[in-house]
């Protein structure tokens, strides 16, 4: 029997507000344990939550970016559970009236086609703290993360393969990153993914029993975990077994999933409206204000790059991988840079430099204007393409004017025949054996003189002019 795969994803995104959702503590990542806490985070008796308006702003922007309807009257709920990293013994979340609902995004499949994935809801909530189990037999609780604002984005079960799930996550991350509400760095926990997967016989309408997957710390592991589950569940069903509703974690070392616990249902959390927070009214003016702050998203930018700038689909995709890179490209083109040349540099030397340095384009000194200036002085013959690589590294590390650096460092390309011809004559004088080989008709003897000339000019001879002048002077030797 063959089975159809049914996948839905729950994505937690940490919002990059300065303070937490219900307390004034810093929400920044990477501080010493429990440095970013106060009495609200520790749930001291009598303390009350105070809503951070910036979190609702971010929630509205996320909902708009994901084509969602927005609840005009929004409230919070208590999700009750006990765990050491949750000192209140409940989490403030949203249950029946999330900030956003009924959304969708398009994903690009491997065959080039597009598929629409529906999004059931996006709700705001507070993050929990973090438990660390030490080798000394003690467990430690760090509440820096407690109260950091989250938006949980829950898709419909519209994905039919691990590949589609991967494509959905890629598209979702791009959109959220473009809004600026989160850096969506999985390595820092600001984007976390839980996957729900079930199988059903082809032609059956009813969903099978789902399994939830956790510990998916990369998009690659999401795909691998889902692929393993497809095989595990299909094998179990074909042998007459029964799929239980359970939570499993992906074990990277063993390339498989391991049972964590039998899955709880929503009733286990005993949701009820949060009594310490009011109803929040979101009017059209507030929504319009947030909509005005949204950027042009990757899909629209890719279409523009292909249709208006004549770039390939591949180039357009690479240039929109991050908003910072796309913004850099657009600024460079607006300053007069040739779109294809700017694209080539960003995908070539710039990308290699960023990878080697472990940095993003915002973290280096290269700017759109000095890149455009460098491309211009390549085009006008001031420097060669080879010399430009040295100039680029200087600009990336130090910034400044490309032309000013070239002139100060003595890197201007030599194109004047009055300068080059005497150097060519000196090359002939210094390499009598090569001249003799050339005069005797030895095969490819003329090729050596190009290297001699470039060495004599420290690589500054204009290659095209040098080749032309060398050919003329060698012809004179032959005559």
Swiss-Prot record:
The keyword Cytoplasm does not apply. Coiled coil: none annotated. This is Aspartyl/glutamyl-tRNA(Asn/Gln) amidotransferase subunit B. Keywords: ATP-binding, Ligase, Nucleotide-binding, Protein biosynthesis. Gene3D superfamilies: 1.10.10.410, GatB domain, N-terminal subdomain (1.10.150.380). Pfam families: GatB_N, GatB_Yqey. It is an enzyme of class 6 (ligase). Allows the formation of correctly charged Asn-tRNA(Asn) or Gln-tRNA(Gln) through the transamidation of misacylated Asp-tRNA(Asn) or Glu-tRNA(Gln) in organisms which lack either or both of asparaginyl-tRNA or glutaminyl-tRNA synthetases. The reaction takes place in the presence of glutamine and ATP through an activated phospho-Asp-tRNA(Asn) or phospho-Glu-tRNA(Gln). GO terms for molecular function: asparaginyl-tRNA synthase (glutamine-hydrolyzing) activity; ATP binding; glutaminyl-tRNA synthase (glutamine-hydrolyzing) activity. InterPro entries: Asn/Gln-tRNA_amidoTrfase_suB/E, Asn/Gln-tRNA_Trfase_suB/E_cat, Asn/Gln_amidotransferase, Asn/Gln_tRNA_amidoTrase-B-like, GatB, GatB_C_1, GatB_Yqey_C_2, Gln-tRNA_amidoTrfase_suB_CS. PROSITE patterns: GATB (PS01234). It comes from the Bacteria. Signal peptide: none annotated. It comes from Streptococcus pyogenes serotype M4 (strain MGAS10750). It catalyses: L-glutamyl-tRNA(Gln) + L-glutamine + ATP + H2O = L-glutaminyl-tRNA(Gln) + L-glutamate + ADP + phosphate + H(+); L-aspartyl-tRNA(Asn) + L-glutamine + ATP + H2O = L-asparaginyl-tRNA(Asn) + L-glutamate + ADP + phosphate + 2 H(+). Its EC number is 6.3.5.-. One of its GO terms (biological process) is glutaminyl-tRNAGln biosynthesis via transamidation. The keyword Transport does not apply.
């Amino acid at each position: 029997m063959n089975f159809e795969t049914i996948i839905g994803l729950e994505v937690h995104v940490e919002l990059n507000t300065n303070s937490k959702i219900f307390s004034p503590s810093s929400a920044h990542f990477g501080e010493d344990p429990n440095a970013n806490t106060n009495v609200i985070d520790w749930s001291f008796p009598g303390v009350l939550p105070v809503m951070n308006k910036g979190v609702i702003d971010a929630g509205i922007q996320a909902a708009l970016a994901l084509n969602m309807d927005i609840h005009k009257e929004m409230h919070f709920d208590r999700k009750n559970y006990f765990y050491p990293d949750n000192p209140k013994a409940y989490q403030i979340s949203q249950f029946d009236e999330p900030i956003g609902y009924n959304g969708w995004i398009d994903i690009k499949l491997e065959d080039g086609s597009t598929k629409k994935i529906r999004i059931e809801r996006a709700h705001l909530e507070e993050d929990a703290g973090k438990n660390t189990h030490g080798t000394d037999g003690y467990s430690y609780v760090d509440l820096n993360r407690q109260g950091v604002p989250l938006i949980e984005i829950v898709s419909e079960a519209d994905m039919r393969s691990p590949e589609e799930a991967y494509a959905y996550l890629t598209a979702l991350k791009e959109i959220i990153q473009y809004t600026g509400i989160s850096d969506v760095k999985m390595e820092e926990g600001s984007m976390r993914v839980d996957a729900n997967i079930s199988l059903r016989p082809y032609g059956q309408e009813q969903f099978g029993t789902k399994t939830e997957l956790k510990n998916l710390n990369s998009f690659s592991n999401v795909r691998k975990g889902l692929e393993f589950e497809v095989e595990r569940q299909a094998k179990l069903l074909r042998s007459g077994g029964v799929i239980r509703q359970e939570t499993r974690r992906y074990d990277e070392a063993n390339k498989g999933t391991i049972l964590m616990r039998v899955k709880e249902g929503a009733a286990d959390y005993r949701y009820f409206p949060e009594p310490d927070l009011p109803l929040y009214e979101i009017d059209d003016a507030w929504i319009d204000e947030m909509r005005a702050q949204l950027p042009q998203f990757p899909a629209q930018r890719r279409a523009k790059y292909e249709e208006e700038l004549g770039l390939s689909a591949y180039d357009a995709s690479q240039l929109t991988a991050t908003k910072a890179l796309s913004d850099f490209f657009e600024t460079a083109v607006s300053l007069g840079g040739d779109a294809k040349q700017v694209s080539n540099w960003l995908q070539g030397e710039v990308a290699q430099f960023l990878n080697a340095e472990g940095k993003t384009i915002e973290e280096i000194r290269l700017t759109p204007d000095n890149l455009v200036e460098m491309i211009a002085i390549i085009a006008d013959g001031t420097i060669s393409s080879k010399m430009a690589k040295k100039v680029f590294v200087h600009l990336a590390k130090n910034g400044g004017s490309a032309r000013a650096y070239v002139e100060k460092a003595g890197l201007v390309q030599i194109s004047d025949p009055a300068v080059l011809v005497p150097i060519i004559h000196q090359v002939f004088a210094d390499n009598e054996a090569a001249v003799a080989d050339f005069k005797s008709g030895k095969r490819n003897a003329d090729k050596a003189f190009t290297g001699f000339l470039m060495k004599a000019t420290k690589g500054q001879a204009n290659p095209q002019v040098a080749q032309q002048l060398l050919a003329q002077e060698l012809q004179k030797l032959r005559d």
